């Protein structure tokens, strides 16, 4: 992302809180890959942005370190509240 372009993307399909863990967003990766510990930018539908860190990735009850294009996953986002992200927003890195 050094030149300002994003190589990885996922549109948020659902958002929910898991007690004791945090906020999870679900979707299918449309481009690239995401890894635990990676920094991401949330592009809101209203044009605003938020920054977050991937705290975990889960696919069908299996914890992953990395997920790739085409994978349907849940991403645990650190330091994000339910007001900071919604369905239709895009996660990029």
Regions from the language model: what does each represent?
Residues 2-93:
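C-terminal effector/interaction modules appended to NTPase cores
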């Amino acid at each position: 992302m050094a030149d300002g372009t994003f190589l990885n993307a996922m549109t948020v399909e659902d958002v929910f809180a898991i007690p004791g863990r945090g906020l999870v967003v679900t979707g299918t990766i449309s481009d690239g890959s995401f890894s635990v510990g990676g920094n991401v930018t949330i592009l809101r539908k209203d044009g605003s942005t938020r920054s977050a860190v991937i705290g975990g990735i889960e696919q069908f009850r299996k914890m992953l370190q990395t997920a790739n294009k085409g994978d349907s996953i849940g991403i645990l986002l650190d330091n994000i509240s339910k007001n900071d992200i919604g369905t239709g927003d895009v996660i990029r890195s």
